[in-house]
Amino acid sequence: MAHTASTFAERARPPQARAYAVAAATLCLLSLSPARAHDASDASIPATPGLQINAAAAVGYQHADQPVPAPRLTGVLGLGDTPTDQRGWALEHGTLGASVRLTPLLGAAVSFGKHGSERAHTEAAWLEARPSADSDFTLGAGRNRMPLGPVIGNAGHLDRFGQMPLIKRAAFNGDWIEDGVNLSWRPHLEGAFEWLQGIDAGLWRARRFPGSENAAWAPTVRARAAGALWGNAGDWEADTFYSRLEPQGRGAYVQRSNSGHIHTAPQCSASLRDITCFDGTVDLLGASASWATPLPGVRLTAAGVLRNERGNLYSQNGDTRYKGRTSGGWLEALWQPTAQWDVAVRQEWLRSTHSLDGPGATLVATDANLLPYHPSRRFSAMLGWRPHPSVLLAVEAGRERIAGQGNSLVALRLVYTSGPLLERSW
């Protein structure tokens, strides 16, 4: 039964699953920071002419009453895919990469990754040039992780916690890797503007969610700042980014159990059977901050992402005008009493509001997984030990409520993030 001039609105809160990834090149452990993945703004190309080969992997055992990750995030406009249940032993993520600086002005990096039983894929294929060896400007092109900042970009990559943050799953369907070009500026300012660490500006193909195969190139900007607080109150770092996408015919499966985890939206050019489609504009805004407090070994981190969408949302059951907002983030506290031990907790949340106006609005909302709505949230705690700087052994426990179902999780994880396996200079 069709509805005319129907309206629908709803709200939601947090969840998700896991997908661990390794950087598009050199992945390293910082003694008081998480394992670090590189994006287009910070490619792991040697500073001087030479070659590096890198590898990293994370394996784990997860025990839970319900599937991990949760089959779906209700009330979130996504791709409708259902991730593979990863309870038991699994390869969370593994990568193998190489980077080379051919001359002081030209370098390149390539990285291949694999998640569990999924096929291997190219995570990075990046060419980078600079006008001089000591230039503040770098121009890169190819495939790479989007420049979101290390807090948001690295979450879910050899992270201390074993699940992809809820907002990353909702906003990007996990990792956001695109083809494009990026101009980086890394100034060395003094005085009143010494806090400004860098600016990135790029154009990206936007073929992966939340973009689509037929989307226009997406402009993306990111700024990074850092400094010391007054009165010896510790050091801080902060990042913010913005991107505008214009997907056309971005399909999503009417939620089903056999769609598998995907990053590229199904096409809307043929039949609308078991598909919902979106044409419109997507605005993505994110920010993150990290504070190394005066307390020894204590670091506090916060991150948030907002996704606004407006346009046409339709299926075989109706055609509507759509406006939606998805927002979420997390707060994290880390205590490292020594360089060998990590104790951390993370609280996540996710919220959504949606408005559909037009024939069949309620049916379209149901097809698009916007109904029924249940709030979601997650709390996680971990204890980690580093017998070697490149190895993290961690025990994790958490509780989440997603799609109206509670789930308790206990995990044992091994994360290996070495420095270069092979390094040559010339």
Annotate each PLM feature.
Residues 35-85, 150, 248-251, 341, ...:
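Outer-membrane beta-barrel biogenesis signature
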Residues 92, 121-123, 205, 217-219, ...:
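Transmembrane beta-barrel architecture of outer-membrane proteins
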Residues 46-48, 52, 69-73, 228-369:
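Detector for outer-membrane/organellar transmembrane beta-barrel domains
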Residues 21-31:
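Bacterial N-terminal signal peptides
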